[in-house]
Amino acid sequence: MTQKLQKIVLPPVYGPADFEARVYACWEQRQAFSPRARGSGTSDSEGCDGHSRQIEGGARTFVIAIPPPNITGVLHMGHCLNTVLQDIVIRYQRMAGACTLWIPGTDHAGIATQHVVERALRKEGIHKREVTREQFVARTQQIKDSHQDTIRMQLRKMGASCDWTCERFTLDAGMSASVREAFVTLYERGLLYRSMYLVNWCPRCGTALSDDEVFHQEKDGALYYVRYPLLPRTEEEGNGVPPPLGTAQVGETIIIATTRPETILADVAVAVHPDDARYQSLIGRKVCVPMVNRIVPIIADSYVAQDFGTGMVKITPAHDPNDWDIGTRHSLEAINMLNPDGSLNDQVPAAYRGLSCAQARIQIVADLQAHGLLSREERIVHSVGVCYRCEAVIEPYLSLQWFVKMKPLASQALAAWKRADVQFHPKKWENTYVRWLEHIRDWCISRQLWWGHRIPVWYCAQCAQQTVSRVDVQRCAHCGSADITQDPDVLDTWFSSWLWPFSTLGWPQETQKLRAFYPTSAVITAYDIIFFWVARMIMAGLEFTQTVPFRDVYLHGLVRDKQGRKMSKSLNNGVDPLHIIRTYGADALRFTLAFMCAQGQDVLIEMDSFKMGSRFANKVWNASRYILGNLEGRRVYAIAHVSLTELDRWIFHTFNETVQQVRTALEAYRFNDAAQAVYEFFWNSFCDWYVEASKCSFQKPDEQEKDRAASVLCTLLEETLRLLHPFLPFVTEEIYRSLSPSVHDTTQAIPSGAHALLMCAPYPVYVPSRVDARACAHIGAVQEIVRAVRTLRAACGIDPQKAVSVRLRPSSPAQDANAAAQVSCVHDPGAVARTYEELICVLAGISSLVYLESDAPKPQVAVATAGTGFELFLVTTEGIDRTMLCARLQKAWQKARQKVQQVERKLADAQFCTHAPEEVVTAERKKLAEARATCHTLAGYLADMNGKPGPLSDSD
């Protein structure tokens, strides 16, 4: 088939703002984000778009439920990275033939959203106490709606190809049904309980937190050594009360070290280790708690660390989790000294009531000192638990809460990992997952908030029983009384999020979506929520659906600034994704993030980082514009009917190898490897070599040769656009649109009609018939000669535009020990050079290329280098600053040698060679060979200049 192409025009300047919004609108208009499906003609309210869906032809599915961003504001760069990686995978899988579904949605984010609303009210001079629960929730709904619109806009600008007809919210009606079903099911299975327990309490948020919602920060503090008066034995026996504290009355004392002197007010015991010889005689004695004159016993417990402080510790069960355990073992009273807002309550002396913990600490330390009871104070740095949202210091607090028994759920999740039902990428996170599950504690799921899923439990005032129900109830299930009250608390946000993979598909209803798309394929998220979300989703999937909710877990790094610091407003180091898009375009943003996202590592960026992605997108635009310009008026043939040159076969071979690398990398979630492979192919192999070489064909008068070259370029451009599309969807779709339908038909790349979009075209596949080692070796020899000339010109400071005279001489095995093994593959370098003389001269800027016999003398005025099987002489009549040239070559050699040593160390690491993917190890070996060849070449330059490689310098 042949077509004569009409004029194809791309604007001369790459301007992403001119087409990105239009391209995305086109995708949405054509419903390109929906799974490949057909309507059955019957109504199904559970369907994504109001119609039932049936997977066409039993195609394999690939499903991701987006990690729902919080509705508290705009998406930051971390969300952006996460979105880009998911979209790359979804676009790749869609083009690779999978029936893909990417479910978008947002999270109600209980604590965080309530903070936002309370802050907004305070700006208006309104306190939360002044509004009703219903008014507060209504105000929160308004903020939620506004922020959801912003999040949708941002995701669209990033190019997210999610199915918007399936969008969910963790507090929508369907999710509420799922949450209630999960709660009641756990209750019926005996995995839920309500108990007075010591919880992590945020006094600023006014709610309990789970262990995983407490972050730890290193803070300056003090270790206070406090004297506790020891009661005389006579008073102990008589159960006497000591006199009021005063310096004169303090007799024998014991010394206890504490970082929290304010909790002395709730002490109920002092503990020592039972094997501590220093205190054997004190076990069973009694002491007086300072400031409150409470008489408490000295007990023995093996938890006590003999090397901490003095080896004696105060026991405050209501305000320390370890003390709570000790108190439980010894049946000690738990005295709660705090109000919910963190102030001291009426369980303490009047002088301290109403003070915050920080204020009480200052006052008590002063009082201890005044009474002669503060032995000393030692400044320390210690770990302090803070709220993950507001960073207020967490207080252990005794309160009535709902808990999930986690050990039975964790055992299932561990068993699934052992069966390899779940795969972690990178694998190092498996250890973190296992360690957390093996040491898991029960999960506190109740939160003292107004925004969230209300706990579906009603308490009866008549019979004091509780009713747990999937639906709202009006009467007690036990006595029938109407005097019932629903639990005022809401559930932890993560209680809805852990159901996300299947609740988004309609669970607990057995919907067609659930049958078709569950379990999902993968979860892609940051490593910092492996506990909050990933592990819990696996447990929920196994408990409620009897299967893991996904097979692959890809945990990417966090986005930080160039100094490795977390991005924050206080540091003013944040990078706004929308600003990047406005400045460089969405494709630049996407490609840069993918290129820099190495598995298991954080991504360090700054504003200028995105120039790389911008340059690459611009390169794609300009190269495509050149190719399309040369297609005008040409007769383009189907590639099957084109006679390919060896250069053509080389580029198809190289493209073929790249396709295999990219597909392998994407299947393994190695995004940076895939991005680097497409970058290397397009910029170097395709543009710098093949497109440049094609200019020779278009400069010839032979019209048939021009048509042949145009046909190959047209095919390569179309296939390359498909290869690049998951990374650069906007620019590739826009360029593809510029290819006329006749090009599509001619290349037979995609079927006509519905799949006229690039994003719906098939992804390139590895084609064994395109492998051509001979062409690869020959063009490799051409490239080596051209690179040698270019490098030598640069080293001599010769203008790239100035033509030079070159002599090529075969090297003998004695001159080049590495050549012998490779010459058989390359054949005669001289013969290859003669075949491609025109191309070599054009690419290297050579005016005269002369071939010498192996025993010919070196030209008189020349600088030389050596390659695989040849010596190359650059003849020049101009004077060369040999000292400067030697220095330049010396520095270049040192850098090349350091590269050799770096890769050698990596390959000498048995762990790396054993555990790294085979293609990664192969790539490193290729790097080593290339680095050694560079060293060899540079050493040849130095030898020719009568210099020699010098010692290595770390600074070079």
From Swiss-Prot:
Recorded superkingdom: Bacteria
Instruction: Decide whether keyword Nucleotide-binding is in the record.
Output: yes
UniProt function note: Catalyzes the attachment of valine to tRNA(Val). As ValRS can inadvertently accommodate and process structurally similar amino acids such as threonine, to avoid such errors, it has a 'posttransfer' editing activity that hydrolyzes mischarged Thr-tRNA(Val) in a tRNA-dependent manner.
An MF annotation (GO) of this entry: ATP binding
Name the residues that bind ATP: 569
Q: Where do we find the motif 'HIGH' region here?
A: 69-79
Sorted alphabetically, which keywords does the UniProt record give?
Aminoacyl-tRNA synthetase, ATP-binding, Coiled coil, Cytoplasm, Ligase, Nucleotide-binding, Protein biosynthesis
Q: How does it assemble?
A: Monomer.
Q: Does the keyword Transferase apply?
A: no
Record-listed E.C. numbers: 6.1.1.9
Gene Ontology cellular component?
cytosol
Name of the featured protein = Valine--tRNA ligase
